[in-house]
């Protein structure tokens, strides 16, 4: 893989800049936007970026940092899903706490924002408290977003309980956007000043990157990733007016800045040190880019990937038509098309051949996989196994120089599994999934040296690109994710069945 980003340089630059910012205050509330862990978007658009860079940065500052996690009560009620992991936001909070503890980072508490006694939220609160985790409940702020006098009063932020913290940097994070991070920071700021403490607020958001051009593919890829939020990148007019320098920010931050500035000034009783929303940020990711062309190409591929993802989400009913069309429009505005993703044409062409050969209207799943050396392999679904499983077996055979004619998995192993699924468990679809085939392969590897060699090649699939001609099941997507394979799908179901699709 060609590298476009220097991870070590970025970590050094970023930690230094955060420490410089905290020197101005007794306590700094640092709003962490985006993903704290497993930032797969950043990893894809910035080749060389460590997906866990942010948490490693915090680990470096662990003596000075504690963490507050925000969760919007409405997201618990409607079981909002974190798309890249396929888990709900409340479950992601539990995962996040475990991961933070794994990096020796102190989790202060969980804040439930816009709380109004929702039943599912109360169950989640009980679950946390009975595991010894502090929980604070913040109701919707009276007067928000325009009535600054009410917001900054005992009727507004004053109604929220004060969260006791002990360290100079308080990171406020969440599973996703709209979780109430900013409101929590400002509420704390209000309480700190009421107690006579000098506290500050800053924002750490990786995208958009303020010091690369507005129409750079890296920033356009961010628009594509947040198409459901309708985020639009813009020139920060406040920054230009203050410093006569061009900086990129996004519409929500620019639109809310005048009110945010007034709130901070009302809390502190003095003029804000921030002249623009860009000033509030501490992001140094742009300084880690070492090969702009590599980053541009990776970002273009991400824009195509996002268009596929949004099309599938539209088909499933998760996003509206406007979101679907906007993702497509962003791709077209960059003069990109679906076929610019190398694995798309081989998958579609093979699927068309199979359909013609079978002379049936049924859709056949074909999965194409591009290996690190540029080789593109395909696998198709059959009565025996899914297309995802077939292409993985073909890939490990390729890496291990094993002939196509050699069976890696003995029929003695496969037949009992299929019988179990069909006869004992009563499954409608008996074809083995990718995970089931990998388990069968691992069993064979115990007695078959060839299968053992093939098993050893699985780590080589990390970072590979794949495309499926039909929508994959959640299980198949998760197996590919665990293997480190980025997969896209055509927005087509494998059959007309509504429940027994995958």
From Swiss-Prot:
The record's section on InterPro entries has: DUF1846, DUF1846_C, DUF1846_N
Q: Which domain of life is it from?
A: Bacteria
Pfam families annotated for this entry?
Answer: DUF1846, DUF1846_C
Q: Which HAMAP family match?
A: UPF0371 (MF_01567)
Family recorded in the similarity comment:
Belongs to the UPF0371 family.
Which NCBIfam families does the entry link to? Answer: PRK13663.1
Tell me the protein's name.
UPF0371 protein CLK_3516
């Amino acid at each position: 893989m060609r590298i476009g980003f220097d991870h070590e340089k970025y970590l050094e630059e970023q930690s230094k800049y955060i420490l410089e910012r905290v020197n101005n205050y007794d306590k700094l509330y640092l709003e962490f936007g985006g993903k704290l862990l497993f930032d797969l978007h950043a990893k894809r658009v910035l080749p060389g970026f460590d997906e866990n860079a942010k948490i490693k940065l915090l680990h470096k500052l662990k003596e000075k940092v504690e963490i507050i996690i925000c969760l919007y009560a409405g997201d618990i009620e409607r079981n909002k899903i974190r798309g890249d992991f396929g888990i709900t936001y409340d479950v992601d909070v539990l995962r996040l706490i475990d991961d933070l503890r794994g990096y020796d980072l102190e989790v202060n508490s969980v804040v439930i924002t816009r709380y109004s006694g929702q039943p599912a939220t109360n169950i989640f609160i009980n679950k946390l408290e009975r595991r010894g985790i502090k929980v604070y409940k913040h109701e919707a702020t009276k007067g928000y977003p325009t009535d600054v006098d009410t917001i900054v009063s005992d009727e507004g932020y004053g109604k929220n309980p004060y969260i006791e913290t002990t360290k100079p940097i308080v990171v406020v994070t969440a599973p996703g956007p709209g979780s109430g991070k900013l409101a929590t920071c400002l509420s704390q700021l209000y309480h700190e000043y009421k107690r006579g403490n000098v506290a500050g607020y800053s924002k750490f958001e990786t995208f958009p990157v303020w010091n690369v051009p507005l129409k750079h593919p890296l920033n356009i890829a961010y628009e594509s990733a947040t198409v459901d939020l309708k985020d639009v990148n813009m020139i920060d007019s406040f920054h230009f007016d203050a410093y006569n320098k061009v900086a990129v920010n996004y519409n929500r931050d620019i639109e809310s800045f005048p009110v945010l500035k007034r709130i901070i000034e009302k809390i502190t009783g003095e003029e804000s040190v921030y002249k623009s929303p860009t000033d509030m940020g501490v992001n140094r990711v742009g300084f880690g880019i070492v090969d702009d062309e590599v980053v541009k190409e990776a970002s273009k591929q991400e824009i195509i990937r996002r268009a596929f993802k949004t099309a599938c989400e539209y088909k499933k009913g998760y996003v509206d038509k406007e979101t679907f069309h906007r993702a497509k429009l962003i791709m077209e505005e960059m003069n990109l098309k679906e076929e610019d993703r190398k694995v798309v044409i081989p998958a579609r062409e093979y699927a068309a051949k199979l359909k013609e050969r079978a002379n049936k209207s049924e859709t056949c799943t074909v999965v194409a996989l591009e290996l690190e050396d540029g080789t593109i392999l395909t696998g198709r679904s059959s009565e025996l196994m899914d297309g995802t499983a077939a292409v993985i077996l073909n890939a490990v055979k390729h890496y291990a120089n094993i002939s196509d004619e050699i069976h890696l998995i003995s029929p003695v192993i496969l037949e009992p599994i299929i019988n179990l699924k069909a006869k004992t468990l009563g499954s409608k679809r008996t074809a083995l999934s990718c995970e089931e085939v990998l388990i069968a392969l691992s069993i064979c590897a115990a007695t078959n040296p060839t299968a053992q060699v093939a098993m050893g090649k699985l780590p080589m699939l990390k970072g590979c690109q794949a495309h499926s001609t039909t929508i994959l099941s959640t299980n198949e997507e998760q197996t590919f994710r665990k293997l480190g394979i980025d997969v896209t799908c055509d927005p087509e179901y494998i059959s007309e069945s509504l429940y027994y699709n995958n």
